[in-house]
């Protein structure tokens, strides 16, 4: 899925669109997406100018966006149909390594269960095959 199609499944736009490409998606199962981290990211101006590190909360957001795409594809819906997914909870969030300019962030999400329009995902972010962050995420479908 290229960036044009990614934009069909996510309502986010610059500077908050954190998915560049989807490499693999199995509806109802899993997704693998990419975020190319460059020095031009606006958050590096303040986090930290001399030693730029991607903020952990933005890694969480990138994993949530990958999970959102998986949710939309699984449910056969798009934001243009009048739906969005909201991040309503995270559990077991862990940060193991820093993400810096030049890294390619591989984002994985697995669909666990859906109950009352809330989907649970397990998510992981990797750089060079090494885990940099992981979390369980809850997203809720909302009609807009």
From Swiss-Prot:
Record flagged with keyword Lyase: yes
Function comment: Involved in unsaturated fatty acids biosynthesis. Catalyzes the dehydration of short chain beta-hydroxyacyl-ACPs and long chain saturated and unsaturated beta-hydroxyacyl-ACPs.
GO molecular function, one term: (3R)-hydroxyacyl-[acyl-carrier-protein] dehydratase activity
Keywords (A to Z) from UniProt: Cytoplasm, Lipid A biosynthesis, Lipid biosynthesis, Lipid metabolism, Lyase
The protein's name: 3-hydroxyacyl-[acyl-carrier-protein] dehydratase FabZ
UniProt record, GO biological process: fatty acid biosynthetic process; lipid A biosynthetic process
Gene: fabZ
Cytoplasm in keyword set: yes
Pfam families linked: FabA
InterPro entries, sorted: FabA_FabZ, FabZ, HotDog_dom_sf
Subcellular location: Cytoplasm
Domain of life: Bacteria
Matches recorded under SUPFAM superfamilies: Thioesterase/thiol ester dehydrase-isomerase
Species for this entry: Alcanivorax borkumensis (strain ATCC 700651 / DSM 11573 / NCIMB 13689 / SK2)
Family note: Belongs to the thioester dehydratase family. FabZ subfamily.
CC terms in the record's Gene Ontology section: cytoplasm; membrane
Gene3D superfamilies on file: Hotdog Thioesterase (3.10.129.10)
Catalysed reaction, written as an equation: a (3R)-hydroxyacyl-[ACP] = a (2E)-enoyl-[ACP] + H2O
Coarse class of the protein's main subcellular location: cytoplasm
E.C. designation(s): 4.2.1.59
Active site residues of this protein: 47
């Amino acid at each position: 899925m290229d960036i044009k199609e990614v934009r069909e499944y996510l309502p986010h736009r610059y500077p908050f669109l954190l998915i560049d490409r989807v490499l693999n998606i199995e509806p109802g199962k899993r997704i693998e997406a990419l975020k190319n981290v460059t020095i031009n990211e606006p958050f590096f101006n303040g986090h930290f100018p001399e030693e730029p590190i991607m903020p952990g909360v933005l890694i969480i957001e990138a994993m949530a966006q990958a999970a959102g795409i998986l949710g939309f594809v699984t449910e056969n819906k798009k934001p243009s149909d009048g739906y969005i997914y909201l991040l309503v909870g995270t559990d077991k969030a862990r940060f193991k390594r820093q993400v810096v300019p030049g890294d390619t962030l591989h984002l994985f999400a697995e669909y666990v269960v859906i109950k009352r329009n809330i989907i649970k995902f397990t998510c992981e972010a990797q750089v060079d095959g090494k885990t940099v962050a992981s979390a369980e995420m809850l997203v809720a479908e909302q009609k807009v």
